[in-house]
From Swiss-Prot:
Miscellaneous comment: Present with 51700 molecules/cell in log phase SD medium.
Lumenal-facing ranges: 21-180
Intervals, Cytoplasmic compartment: 202-211
Pfam short name (any one): EMP24_GP25L
Subcellular location: Endoplasmic reticulum membrane; Golgi apparatus membrane
Signal sequence coordinates: 1-20
Species this protein is from: Saccharomyces cerevisiae (strain ATCC 204508 / S288c) (Baker's yeast)
Function of the molecule: Constituent of COPII-coated endoplasmic reticulum-derived transport vesicles. Required for efficient transport of a subset of secretory proteins to the Golgi. Possesses a C-terminal dilysine motif that interacts with COPI coat subunits. Facilitates retrograde transport from the Golgi to the endoplasmic reticulum.
Protein name stated in the entry: Endoplasmic reticulum vesicle protein 25
TM ranges: 181-201
Keyword NAD included in the entry's annotation: no
Record's keyword terms, sorted: Endoplasmic reticulum, ER-Golgi transport, Golgi apparatus, Membrane, Protein transport, Signal, Transmembrane, Transmembrane helix, Transport
InterPro entries associated with the record: Emp24-like, GOLD_dom
Length: 211
């Protein structure tokens, strides 16, 4: 148990220490989407803060799309610059993508936008300042509660992965049984067909007085 607590504490420290992403997206007249993928569990709050340099009308149109792997779209914003915040609650455990598309309005110009992306989910996405004010919590109480919620989320994630592994193993075993049963059925059918062909040829030769 102490080992698990130490592991969780270390993982929490790594999660908290993660900073936002910084990258550039070159403008193109035929742009391809650049996507950042993350995973979220059912019921988790997700908050994505996006900042782009430049300005609208600077010769490039930066488009934003936020959607998950099951087809839900949470935000679509075209030709934006500056700050955008996207918040949603995941309806199911799935991966989601934050995608950017930078379209150049003119050919022959080398343009790009610098993007800053910060994605937080679960306990990290909650407004702890507001919670502290509403519930009149001390700073240490807020921090302990935040760490507790992060720990619960990690335990839930580990439980989900364990259950998923069990489902995949059951599916694999079921598939193996079906393949084995199908192979046995094929052998029986082929053997029966062989016996029938032998009897048919034997009767045919007898009627022709060949044997």
């Amino acid at each position: 148990m102490q080992v698990l607590q130490l592991w969780l504490t270390t993982l929490i420290s790594l999660v908290v220490a993660v900073q936002g992403l910084h990258f550039d997206i070159a403008a193109s007249t035929d742009p391809e989407q650049v996507c950042i993928r993350d995973f979220v569990t059912e019921g988790q709050l997700v908050v994505a803060d996006i900042h782009s340099d430049g300005s609208v009308g600077d010769g490039q149109k930066l488009n934003l799309f936020v959607r998950d792997s099951v087809g839900n779209e949470y935000r679509r914003k075209r030709d934006f610059a500056g700050d955008v915040r996207v918040a949603f609650t995941a309806p199911s455990s799935t991966a989601f993508d934050v995608c950017f598309e930078n379209q150049a309005q003119y050919r022959g110009r080398s343009l790009s936008r610098a993007i800053e992306l910060d994605i937080e989910s679960g306990a990290e996405a909650r407004d702890w300042n507001k919670i502290s004010a509403n519930e009149k919590l001390k700073p240490i109480e807020v921090e302990l509660r935040r760490v507790e919620e992060i720990t619960d989320e990690i335990v839930d994630e580990l439980t989900y992965l364990k259950n998923r592994e069990e489902r995949l193993r059951d599916t694999n075993e079921s598939t193996n049984r079906r393949v084995r049963n199908f192979s046995i059925l094929v052998i029986i059918v082929l053997s029966s067909l062989g016996v029938w062909q032998v009897n048919y040829l034997k009767n045919y030769f007898k009627t022709k007085h060949i044997i």
